[in-house]
Amino acid sequence: MTTLVELQSVTVTFGDRHVLDQVSMKLERGQITTLIGPNGAGKSTLVKVITGLRKPSTGHVVRQKGIRIGYVPQKLQLNSTLPLTVDRFMRLAGRYDENARKEALSLVGGTHLHHSDMHSLSGGEMQRVLLARALLQKPDVLVLDEPVQGVDVNGQLELYNLIQSLRDILNCSILMVSHDLHLVMAKTDNVICLHHHICCSGEPDTITNHPSYVALFGQQQSEQLALYHHHHNHEHDLAGSPVGPCQHNKQHGHDNA
C-alpha cells in the first residue's frame, strides 16, 4: 500500500496551548480514513496541516512528490444576491474545459445540475457540486470536512455510498472529518479518534469499544455503534476472529490495563 501523506510527531501550538500534540498518522492510497473527535479536538487544525495550509510547530509532514490534494469544505458561504450557476461555480476552480466539468459532475451523479442556480440547490446537491469541483484536478488525496452536514439521513447514506464509489474509481486516499460513526461505520477502512493527540486508531469495530472512545463519546453510543459487543478482553474482526487491542499512544495513559 502506498503512503501519500505521513505526519511524523506533529505538534501545533497556539500560545501555550497544544492544539495538536505529537500526532503521527498516514494516509494510504485506496483507503478511506475517518477522523472523529469532539468539538475543539483539533480536527480542523489537523486538516490544515495535511492540506499544507498550516505548518506544524514541530514535527514533519511528508507528502509523496507531485500528489494533488482536493478539499471539500464543511460549508460554503455564497452571496445570495450574486447570480451563479453550477457551471460558472465550477469554472472558478481553474482552467478546466467544459468536458472536464461535465465529467466531474457525472462522477458525482450531478449532470442534471449543470445549469442550476447555486442558491437553489438542496444540501445533498450542494455537497455533490462541491465534490465535483474538488474532483476536477483528479486528486490523489480527497479531504472531506463534515461531508454530510445539512443533509437528511437518506441523503447521507447516498453520499457515503458515493464517496466509497469515488475511492474505488479514482484509487485515491479519502480523509473524512466527522463527529460520529453512525453512518460512516460500514464505509470507512480506518478510524482515528483525536482529542489533541491520537487517542486510538484502527478499524471501526475495534474503535467503538476502546476505552478512549468510550471516555470521549460515552458508553451508550459505544454500545450502539459496536459491530460486536462482548465483555471480553479482546475484540473481533468481521469474520469473528479475535484481534488485538486498538493501536494507541500509551504515553497519554489510555492503555487497556
Swiss-Prot record:
One of its GO terms (molecular function) is ATP binding. Coiled coil: none annotated. It is a peripheral membrane protein. InterPro entries: AAA+_ATPase, ABC_transporter-like_ATP-bd, ABC_transporter-like_CS, Metal_Ion_Import_ABC, P-loop_NTPase. One of its GO terms (cellular component) is plasma membrane. Disulfide bonds: none annotated. Residues 234-257 are annotated as: Disordered. It catalyses: Zn(2+)(out) + ATP(in) + H2O(in) = Zn(2+)(in) + ADP(in) + phosphate(in) + H(+)(in). Part of the ABC transporter complex ZnuABC involved in zinc import. Responsible for energy coupling to the transport system. This is Zinc import ATP-binding protein ZnuC. The gene is znuC.
